[in-house]
């Protein structure tokens, strides 16, 4: 298999945050989605980074003094992020995809213009490998 599209969860099926969301909006969206990390996009659909629960925790402590009212006034792009998930282009090799997935729970996939088109989860890659290595009887 040499096609990233095989593993892709399309943008329409992904949870994501817009870069103009407040900290409170991000917390609520992440709670509903049930994810510990979520992509950040701008309103043009371009990938801007990844927000993780730990980033939110430190932002609430250091920027908002643990006050949800203050979290309504601060934007998520003000939050120092420890590490963004590095995207791959849709034309990337499977080797590049697997290398990124070894260090990230998901790999954002972008087109040639930097627009987010979806993501590939580490789980999808592992499940594919498991199916190929341990063929069902």
Predicted segments — roles?
Residues 1-14, 71-84:
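Bateman (tandem CBS) regulatory domains
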Residues 1-2, 135-137:
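Short, Lys/Arg-enriched, disordered terminal segments
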Residues 8-9, 31, 61, 80-81, ...:
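Alpha-helix boundary recognition
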Residues 16-35, 41, 86-104, 110-113, ...:
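The conserved cystathionine-beta-synthase
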Residues 35, 39, 46-64, 103, ...:
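Short beta->alpha transition motifs characteristic of CBS
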Residues 59-62, 78-88:
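Regulatory sensory and allosteric helical modules in signal-transduction proteins
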């Amino acid at each position: 298999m040499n096609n990233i599209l095989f593993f892709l969860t399309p943008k329409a099926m992904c949870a994501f945050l817009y870069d103009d969301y407040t900290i409170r909006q991000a917390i609520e969206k992440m709670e509903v989605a049930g994810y510990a990390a979520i992509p950040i996009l701008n309103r043009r659909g371009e990938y801007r980074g990844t927000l993780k629960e730990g980033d939110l925790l430190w932002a609430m402590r250091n920027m908002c003094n643990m006050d949800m009212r203050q979290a309504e006034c601060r934007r998520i792009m003000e939050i120092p992020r420890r590490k963004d998930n590095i995207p791959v282009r849709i034309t990337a090799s499977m080797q590049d995809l697997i290398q990124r997935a070894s260090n990230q729970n998901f790999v954002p996939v972008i087109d040639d213009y930097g627009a987010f088109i979806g993501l590939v989860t580490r789980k999808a890659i592992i499940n594919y490998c498991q199916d190929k290595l341990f063929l069902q009887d």
